[in-house]
Amino acid sequence: MSVRALAARPAALLRHRGLGPAVSDALVITQRNLLKYVRVPTLLVFSTIQPVMFVLLFAYVFGGAVNIPGVNYKDFLLPGIFIQTAVFGSMQTGIGLAEDISHGMVDRFRSLPMARSAVLAGRTISDTIRNLFVVLLMTGVGFLIGFRFHGGVLFAMAGILLAVLFSHAFSWISALMGLTIRDVESTQAASFASIFPFVFASSAFVPIFTMPGWLQAFAKVNPISLAANGIRALTLDQKTAHFVLGGNRWTHVWQALLSIAVMLVIFVPLSIRAYRKT
């Protein structure tokens, strides 16, 4: 179904609230957003360059300065890169919504007989799909430089799924910023300024126990640390995971899932409320 097909629906369906039609509408918007990468493939290319550069930079430039006894730094690094990629990739959700608002696309969508939830759901889903592609690409790059999954195929799939779920949850935070600020350049600047400290004050690139004491307290509850450590609990072998992360493997996984659930519970309603006010 296309956007034109949505416009051809009877007016009586304007305020339908059934789950089926709402899902269908969201998928239409998802398709519309993904087609942008087909028509302008350079957008997808440039969205993958930065993560690849970070992998190579930290693995070969900074990696020599990071010494974790008994642990291959690349095995420690890649889960952090997954989360960093997911977070920075999710910034596109807010930027895309701000762009749609500034170009009048949101007003056009409002005039169509479609579920109001479709615009937000379609945007976050399409960006999550793009982030999945980038995470898979990062996995391939990681294998080329020596990264390995040590927990088996199922744990590897679970780790990738955890990264994708985190990117989806973070997309709703970005959506709220885009809907609140509504200007593309301002949204981009605000997103980077607010996310950057969380990424680098986390365990994404170095273990928490190597940080100063005052920073450890923040890093331990940082959602990015929780997500990165949750993935490491699945990708490292059990002995190494216990040494690097401490505690039980599944505790870290559940903490990551809890952080995702908390973000969704808080920011999905706030984003929907902000969308209604646009």
Question: What is the meaning of each model-derived region?
Answer:
Residues 53-58, 74-145, 170, 174, ...:
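Hydrophobic alpha-helical transmembrane segments of multi-pass membrane transport proteins
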Residues 58-67, 145-150, 154, 181-183, ...:
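Short helix-capping/hinge motifs at transmembrane helix termini and TM-loop junctions
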Residues 2-5, 21-31, 202-245, 254:
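Short hydrophobic, aromatic-rich alpha-helical segments embedded in or entering the lipid bilayer
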Residues 116-191, 196, 249-272:
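Alpha-helical transmembrane segments and their short interhelical loops
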Residues 9-17, 68-70, 237-251:
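Short helix-coil transition/hinge motifs at the ends and kinks of transmembrane helices
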Residues 2-11, 235, 239, 254-278:
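Junction motif at the cytosolic side of a transmembrane helix
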Residues 31-50:
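Membrane-interface helix starts
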Residues 60-64, 178-225, 229:
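Transmembrane helix segments
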